[in-house]
Curated annotation (Swiss-Prot):
With S4 and S12 plays an important role in translational accuracy. This is Small ribosomal subunit protein uS5. The keyword Repeat does not apply. The N-terminal domain interacts with the head of the 30S subunit; the C-terminal domain interacts with the body and contacts protein S4. The interaction surface between S4 and S5 is involved in control of translational fidelity. Pfam families: Ribosomal_S5, Ribosomal_S5_C. GO terms for cellular component: cytosolic small ribosomal subunit. Transmembrane segments: none annotated. The gene is rpsE. Part of the 30S ribosomal subunit. Contacts proteins S4 and S8. One of its GO terms (molecular function) is structural constituent of ribosome.
Length: 147
């Protein structure tokens, strides 16, 4: 695979989580970040980073996202066909839309679809709204699209 130029990618933080560990002296906080990166030209990836500070968690998540890049097949401004995918308790439904419809997506699905470069799509998130599971379900669905 050719070398990837990180400058042409945009990144979006989908979720920041705080985890608390209670110790004898009080509470210890740690953070995790779920980040999506994409070049709006079919390449998109997501990553999870964990650290004691939020900026460090985001940086780790971005590095992880570049290791998990996938290529999304785009037909014109939309996807080629309907697809439904389930990951754990989250189900995602993706449907192609006619030109001019725009991105109709909510929550964690919108940044993925936009950063992939899809301009017209209808999406529906069913079941669990856990951000990580919705992102995984969306990625798996986009990876399964055939031209």
């Amino acid at each position: 695979m050719e070398e990837i130029n990180r400058e042409e990618f945009q990144e979006v933080v989908v979720n920041i989580g705080r985890v608390t560990k209670v110790v004898k002296g009080g509470r210890r906080f740690r953070f995790n970040a779920l980040v999506v990166v994409g070049n709006k030209n079919g390449l998109v990836g997501f990553g999870l980073g964990k650290a004691k500070e939020v900026p460090d968690a985001i940086k780790k998540a971005v590095d992880d996202a570049f290791k998990n890049l996938i290529h999304v097949t785009i037909k014109g401004t939309t996807i080629a066909h309907d697809i439904e995918h389930k990951y754990n308790a989250s189900r995602i439904l993706l449907k192609p839309a006619s030109e001019g419809t725009g991105v109709i997506a909510g929550g964690s699905t919108r940044p993925i679809v936009e950063l992939a470069g899809i301009k017209d799509i209808l999406t529906k998130s069913l079941g669990s709204n856990n951000p990580y599971n919705v992102v995984r379900a969306t990625f798996d669905a986009l990876a399964k699209i055939k031209a």
